[in-house]
Structure formats: C-alpha cells, structure tokens
C-alpha cells in the first residue's frame, strides 16, 4: 500500500492553515535575514584555495580536507556530464554568498568526518534521469567509514532547481532531496546540523522503486538517539510529485527518525 508522509513543520504558536501564505513567508524571510547576519562572520581567506572558474570545481576532489572559497559566481552550463562531484569531502567550502548555477549533478557525492558548507547559492540546477548524483547539494553524509567522528555543518545554503528522476535506479531503493539525500550517522561523537537553509525545487519521480525517501531538506536517515541530527530555521518550497509505491515524501524530510527540527517551514505540493 502506498505510503506518503507529508511533513509541514512550523515552530510557531499558530496553525499554518489560519495564516495567509504571503504573511508567513514574509516573516520567515525577515527572520532568515537576521539569522544570516548573526552567523556570517568576517573571515580571513588567506589560507583558502580559491574557486573562481568551472574548472576550479575539480579542486574539491584533489584535497578533500582542504579549505575552499568561491571568489566569483560559477556557471556550469557547459559541463553537463563531465563534472565529477566531490567524494569523501571533509573540508570547508565557503561560498561567500556566490552562486553555482546550471549544474546537472549534485555538488558533493559524499561528505564524511568533520566538514562545513556555508554561504552558498545553487541556482537553476537541472538534474535528469541520466545525470550523476541523487540530490542538488549533497548525495550522502556518511560517518560509517572507519568509525569517523566529528561535526558537519551546512549553513546559509539556498538551492533552486528541478529534477526528473523517473528512470533513475529503476526498481531500487534510494532517496532524493534539496540539501542532502541521505544522512548516515550512529554515534554520540557524530553530529550534523543544517541551519538557515532554503530550497525551492521541483521534483518528479516514477521509478517503480520501493523504500524511496523524498524530502525538501533531507531525504532519509540511518541513525539512532545517540547521534545528533538537527534541522533549524529552514524553508522548503516547490513540489515533489511521486507515483512510487511505498515512497515517503515530506516537505522537510522524507523519513526522519530521531531528527530535531526547529523553526522550519514547508509549503510544497506533494
């Protein structure tokens, strides 16, 4: 039997259905601006490796524990099918408010250990059935390798794009989301925090898959009560249209065991 969970989360002392949509989003945008001012600090980028061209994006794969910053907007429109998402990343990517646009794949295939991704915009991503990666920003956050420990922070990231995964991994389980498709953490020494992020995405799926998790912020999780997974001050807009049997769909998370969600808002067509 088809199951869908619709996660529309608000941490306000009001009922969302009684508030005009425009008013809610105006309040959210105002608060989001305040959060940004409080968390974005002046930074000395002298020890950061610059990313200013599409070719520079490959640097994320060279030194996976390095510190990188964008010094310009990046247009990936001519790199369809050739960009290889970073694997095993455990460094820092500071977007400095810049935009990566016209991507046809996820930015990171996997993030492990301690890592930070902040102050970044993803715009006009177009993920097709044959394109690499599951998601827009991160495919998997995975602490399973070698019992890794640490803290992962995803902060001040805005994602806008569309995805058609109707033919992707037909007949298999999986997940898809705006920020991170799957989070795998188990120990009390491991934590993931997603703060002050927003997505405006359109996803369509018809894969015949089972146990599929589709979410605005995260897709699915494997974790227990000892580890920490926190989603705070996030906004999710757009649509997720799935005819997959036994799929789990949510505006914030498709499947979210032991996830702490605070002050988040979703307005998605599911």
Model-derived segments and spans:
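Hydrophobic core
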Residues: 10, 14-18
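Predominantly extracellular beta-rich ligand-binding scaffolds that present long acidic/polar faces
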Residues: 24, 33-270
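Sec/Tat signal peptide C-region and signal peptidase I cleavage site
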Residues: 22-28
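Positively charged n-region of N-terminal signal peptides that target proteins for export
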Residues: 1-8
């Amino acid at each position: 039997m088809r199951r869908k969970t619709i996660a529309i989360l608000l941490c306000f002392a009001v009922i969302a259905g009684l508030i005009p949509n425009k008013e809610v989003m105006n309040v959210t945008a105002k608060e989001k601006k305040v959060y940004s001012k409080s968390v974005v600090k002046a930074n000395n980028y002298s020890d950061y490796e610059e990313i200013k061209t599409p070719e520079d994006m490959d640097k994320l794969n060279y030194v996976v524990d390095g510190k990188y910053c964008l010094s310009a907007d990046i247009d990936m429109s001519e790199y369809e099918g050739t960009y290889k998402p970073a694997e095993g990343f455990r460094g820092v990517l500071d977007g400095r408010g810049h935009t990566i646009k016209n991507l046809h794949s996820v930015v990171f295939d996997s993030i492990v250990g301690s890592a930070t991704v902040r102050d970044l915009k993803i715009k006009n991503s177009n993920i097709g059935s044959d394109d690499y990666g599951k998601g827009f920003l991160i495919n998997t956050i995975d602490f399973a390798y070698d019992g890794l420990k640490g803290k992962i922070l995803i902060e001040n990231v805005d994602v806008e794009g569309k995805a058609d995964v109707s033919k992707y991994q037909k007949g298999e389980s999986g997940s898809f989301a705006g920020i991170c498709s799957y989070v795998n953490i188990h120990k009390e020494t491991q934590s993931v925090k997603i703060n002050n992020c927003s997505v405006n995405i359109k996803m369509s799926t018809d894969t015949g898959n089972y146990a599929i998790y589709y979410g605005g912020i995260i897709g699915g999780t494997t974790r227990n009560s000892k580890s920490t997974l926190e989603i705070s001050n996030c906004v999710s807009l757009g649509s997720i249209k799935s005819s997959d049997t036994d799929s789990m769909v949510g505006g914030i998370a498709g499947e979210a065991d032991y996830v702490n969600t605070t002050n988040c808002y979703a307005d998605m067509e599911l």
